[in-house]
Design a protein with these regions (language model features):
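Active-site bordering "gate/hinge" segments
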Residues: 1-48, 52-264
């Protein structure tokens, strides 16, 4: 279907000049205009993309955001600082413990509260597990969307072991809600058991699973053809657009907030 504007469209100024700007971008011969999302399993109802396709290659994408507004700010007005942690978990259910830590860290900074060294260590370990949890799904879901189902299953299998750790410390697998202002929900049930679970995952399971996922994807000709050289971001572009984390480092930006400006 061709891409058309409506009077309710908020991202374009509906003047003649703006419509002229779109000429040549719609109904182009040999190009396919695809309306992707928001009601699509891969978008999770968070955004809509109007894609211009040349075969499998996306030539242009016009994003439309704003579908995820859930009134979080208004909800926060009726909760205290510790109750709100439950909502932060839902903001990013892929790695909820990271949002728990970020929320209470912000409150503690405003209130000038210092954490004990033990609390900082526990939060740091859980934060890193949360990042691994996030990246496993990121790579796995990308593989799934590009036709490499097995890589997705490998990633999800390893995430289950992080869920086991979260369940052990908090009693909740999916949304641990473990942090509190100035500390944690409670101390580790058993430090020795916690250490064994973490070491088993990081030193035994994860190195093998990462190697397996890497082999599955890097030797998958279809997957490689669909990603190699596509959508590359230069170091200069990454810096100009303020990319952070793995995206920035993959583009050659030697920047890691945990080392450059530690917050725990």
């Amino acid at each position: 279907m061709p891409y058309t504007l409506t009077p309710l469209e908020k991202t374009f100024d509906l003047e003649i000049e703006s419509l002229d700007e779109l000429k040549g971008r719609v109904d182009v011969p040999d190009r396919w205009i695809l309306n992707f999302g928001p009601q699509h399993p891969a978008t999770h109802t968070t955004l809509r993309l109007v894609l211009e396709l040349d075969g499998e290659r996306i030539v242009r994408a016009t994003p439309h955001i704003g579908y995820l507004h859930s009134g979080f700010e208004k909800l926060a007005e009726h909760q205290d600082y510790n109750q709100w942690v439950c909502t932060t978990s839902r903001m990013d259910y892929i790695s909820p413990i990271v949002n728990n830590i970020a929320w209470h860290h912000a409150v503690e900074k405003l209130l000038d509260i210092d954490l004990t060294p033990r609390c900082k260590v526990i939060r740091t370990i859980l934060g890193e597990l949360g990042r691994i949890q996030n990246h496993l799904l990121c790579v796995g879901a990308a593989a799934l969307d590009l036709g490499a189902l097995t890589g997705f299953l490998y990633g999800f299998n390893e995430r289950e072991h992080i869920y086991d750790i979260m369940d052990y410390i908090s009693g909740h697998r999916f949304h641990p809600d473990y942090t509190r202002v100035g500390g944690l929900m409670y101390d580790l049930p058993c430090e020795e058991t916690f250490q064994k679970m973490v070491h088993n995952f990081t030193d035994v399971r994860m190195p093998k699973s990462i190697g397996d996922i890497e082999s599955l994807l890097n030797t998958n000709r279809i997957f490689v053809d669909r990603v190699q050289g596509i959508g590359t971001i230069s170091k200069e572009e990454a810096t100009a657009w303020s990319l952070t984390g793995p995206l920035a480092r993959a583009s050659g930006v030697t920047r890691d907030l945990r080392k450059d400006d530690p917050y725990l």
